[in-house]
Curated annotation (Swiss-Prot):
One of its GO terms (cellular component) is plasma membrane. Belongs to the UPF0761 family. This is UPF0761 membrane protein IL2447. Its main location: membrane. Keywords: Cell inner membrane, Cell membrane, Membrane, Transmembrane, Transmembrane helix. InterPro entries: UPF0761_bac, Virul_fac_BrkB. It is found in: Cell inner membrane. HAMAP family: UPF0761 (MF_00672). It is a multi-pass membrane protein.
Length: 284
């Protein structure tokens, strides 16, 4: 009996993976990731300017601004973060000297990135309906203004947890290391769940969004470690590109990040569709 159950479970899993592969290819996920990478490269500096501008409006987060910068640059690029931070800080400083019209233009460019993300995810859900442009603009504006506040609150909570873990590590060895490993995964999981549930124009059940978010969060953390190892032990890119080596590395990392985001989205919608296609169990 158990052998039959395991065989059924194996066939069910194999069928789902096959369906996921077909969905991944039919949605041209790798091409979509490339498009989002291109838009992200254009929108990166405007988005950072908008975020830091909003942060400066809340003095309570002044102490956390440096932590936010470190977290952003660590996730933007697992290695070469210091060099990237130097470049982007220079860009942000130059952009902050712009007039009100220039800052407004930066907001528009940042909103273009969010619009591209919206369209990409809804294309995966194959939802042709669209929000009114005023509603979309209001949502994007709210995310741009409230997003930094939520990030600041999350960093404050993370800093508090880290201080507690450092204290507890004196009594139980390994707690701080566990928190350092666990908190980024939980943060990524929450981010992906919110994205997969709120961005699509149709209702997505939490269990499906959570499934895709777990896989995406684990892949994201694993890719950071593997990418760091590759950059550290196989630095051939530096010999080829020299001082410009950070640029292609950043492009590749942003592409991998978007690919993971889209993989999680395809997993979420594939699981939902595959479950609906399965015949209902016969009642005795």
């Amino acid at each position: 009996m158990k052998q039959i159950e395991w065989k059924s479970y194996f066939n069910h899993t194999l069928g789902f993976l096959k369906y996921f592969g077909q969905r991944f290819n039919s949605d041209n996920t790798n091409i979509t990731a490339g498009h989002l990478t291109y838009v992200s490269m254009l929108s990166l500096v405007p988005l950072l300017v908008v975020m830091f501008t909003v942060f400066s409006a809340f003095p309570m987060f002044d102490e956390l601004k440096e932590n936010l910068e470190q977290a952003l640059f660590a996730n933007l690029l697992p290695t070469s973060g210091e060099q990237l931070e130097e470049y982007l800080n220079e860009f942000v400083t130059n952009a902050s000297k712009m007039t009100a019209i220039g800052v407004g233009f930066l907001f528009i460019v940042a909103i273009m990135l969010m619009s591209a993300i919206d369209k990409a995810l809804n294309s995966i859900w194959r939802d042709s309906s669209s929000r009114h442009w005023l509603v979309s603009f209001a949502v994007y504006w709210m995310l741009l203004t409230l997003g930094p506040v939520l990030i600041g609150s999350g960093l404050a909570a993370t800093s508090y947890l880290m201080s507690l873990s450092q204290f507890a590590d004196e009594y139980v060895s390994g707690i701080q290391s566990f928190v350092l490993w666990f908190v980024p995964i939980v943060t990524s999981f929450v981010f992906f769940v919110l994205m997969y549930q709120l961005v699509p124009n149709r209702q997505v059940k939490f269990r499906y969004a959570a499934f895709g978010a777990v896989i995406a969060a684990l892949l994201f953390e694993l890719s950071k470690q593997l990418f760091s190892l590759y950059i550290t032990f196989f630095p051939t890119y530096q010999a080829i590109y020299g001082a410009l080596a950070t640029i292609p590395i950043l492009i590749v990392w942003i592409y991998l990040s978007w690919l993971i985001v889209l993989i999680g989205a395809v997993l979420t919608v594939s699981l939902e569709e595959y479950q609906l296609q399965q015949p209902e169990p016969k009642s005795d």
